[in-house]
A protein has these predicted regions:
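A short, active-site helix/loop in glycosyltransferases that binds the activated sugar's phosphate group
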Residues: 238-271
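Nucleotide-activated donor-binding/catalytic signature segment of Leloir-type glycosyltransferases, i.e.
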Residues: 327-344
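Short Ser/Thr-rich beta->loop micro-motif in glycosyltransferases that lines
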Residues: 360-364, 386
Length: 441
């Protein structure tokens, strides 16, 4: 340990802040973990209690609002266009920029803007955070390859620069310049800066977080890897180090995908070290056993909708969209058991998830409002077609059918006597854990 006055505490260190990292973070918090959470991600929309190793040095400008797509600064006479999936910046007929939205996309909140040169190669990316200010800028070479990224404080001063060619990281702090050879050194410096010593490190990657663990002083050999990658035909080299007992601090591996865990055991991984562990989900409600079916779509291409509506006259179909609906879809108003919600607001969509007890993932094109996950969290029984399914993580494999076998879907919906059992199976397929499972880690 580098200093006796440091706070000794368990730490959760995440490689990025994608969906599975968020689920791990939420599982820890729900289970009562009150230690610090850090990430190598420079995401500008992190929860307030998650610290980026980069943007920590930029300070906070709280109270501002996230930037809407038409609030991007552009030269006079340039035009900004947007849909529910992204935006573009035009100079007459020339596309000069591309706008990427933060999730949920339909709110059109700006996350990143790519700026193109005259050959339509991205040369600069501007990064905006949840307070609406530009906190980072990425530079690309003329081939569109990453060169560097700078991070700024609220006054626009450059605080951190990462060179993607040399992998060096430069920190400008208190009129001094610090140079770090890699992200691992940089992360360790942040721990020192905050007077934190990780007594246990919980982490989810064999990349940077693993090397941070290996570079900390060994105390009790109690660090834990949460393995979130999918099925693969071999055991990763750094994982083998842990399995062979050669890691300085890590002694346990929790695998968060069933297929990946089964394969690791098949490959000879020690069952005492490698164990399955899913997530603690915050379920919003219980299934009420009503006859309400929900479909969320921005497309009028809904597989077998007509057949399902006709074959199940006693079921109420609620079809919602963030956009206006085409005449093709509006024509379903002729059925007494179909209710359409064009231009649906967030509050209305939430009410539908609370009202309905079945979700059909049968629409083509992109998924909206993270509908499959929301259906899962609201305990709707989820069914879909192979041709349309968006997120298999939360769906029982035997409830995903070929569209030609839609009658099998109907039989499951009609079989109300097995609804609770099927919901329990659905929760199991998503590896649902309870709070005590995480307290025992």
């Amino acid at each position: 340990m580098e200093g006796s006055c440091m706070l000794e505490t368990p730490v959760l260190l995440l490689e990025n802040f994608d969906e599975e990292s968020q689920m791990l973070y939420q599982s820890f918090r729900t289970s009562g973990f009150d230690g610090p959470v850090f990430t190598f991600s420079d995401e500008g929309f992190l929860p307030d209690d998650v610290t980026s190793i980069y943007t920590y040095y930029c300070g906070k400008k709280e109270g501002g609002k996230a930037r809407y797509f038409n609030q991007i600064d552009v030269p006079d006479y340039w035009e900004i266009k947007a849909s529910n999936s992204g935006g573009q910046v035009f100079d007459l007929n020339h596309e000069r920029g591309k706008i990427f939205f933060a999730s949920p996309l339909h709110k059109r909140i700006v996350k990143i803007v790519d700026w193109y040169d005259d050959t339509h190669v991205a040369r600069v990316s501007d990064h905006y955070n949840k307070y609406g200010f530009l906190y980072a800028r990425t530079i690309f070479n003329k081939k569109g390859q990453l060169v560097s990224r700078s991070y700024y404080d609220v006054s626009g001063n450059e605080k951190v620069v990462e060179n993607f060619v040399t992998h060096d990281i430069i920190l400008n702090q208190d009129d001094k310049v610090y140079i770090f050879k890699n992200k691992v050194e940089f992360a360790k410096h942040l721990f020192t800066e905050l007077d934190i010593y990780p007594t246990r490190l919980f982490y989810n990657s064999l990349s940077n977080p693993f090397f941070v663990s290996e570079n900390l002083e060994d105390k009790e050999h109690s660090d834990v890897l949460f393995w979130q990658e999918g099925y693969r035909e071999d055991i990763p080299g750094n994982m083998q180090v842990i399995l062979d007992g050669h890691s300085r601090r890590t002694s346990k591996i929790y695998v968060q995908k069933k297929e990946a865990h089964e394969k690791l055991i098949e490959l000879g991984a020690n069952r005492d070290i490698v164990k399955p562990l899913g997530f603690v989900y915050n379920f919003e409600k219980e299934n009420q056993h009503t006859n309400n079916i929900l479909i969320c779509t921005n497309s009028d291409r809904i597989e077998k909708l007509n057949e399902l509506v006709v074959c199940m006259p006693n079921m109420k179909f609620h079809v919602c969209a963030l956009t206006e609906m085409s005449q093709k879809l509006m024509s379903f108003e002729k059925y007494d058991n179909v209710h359409l919600y064009p231009g649906c607001k967030a509050s209305e969509i939430l009410n539908l998830f609370n009202t309905c007890d079945y979700y059909l993932d049968i629409n083509y094109e992109n998924e909206i409002v993270d509908a499959t996950k929301e259906a899962f969290l609201h305990n709707l029984l989820i069914l879909g077609f192979n041709q349309t399914i968006h997120n298999r993580k939360y769906v029982l494999p035997d409830f995903v059918y070929d569209a030609n076998n839609y009658q099998d879907m109907i039989r499951v919906i009609f079989d109300a006597s097995h609804l609770d059992m099927n919901l329990e199976r659905q929760r199991n397929v998503a590896m649902t854990q309870n709070v005590q499972d995480y307290k025992n880690v």
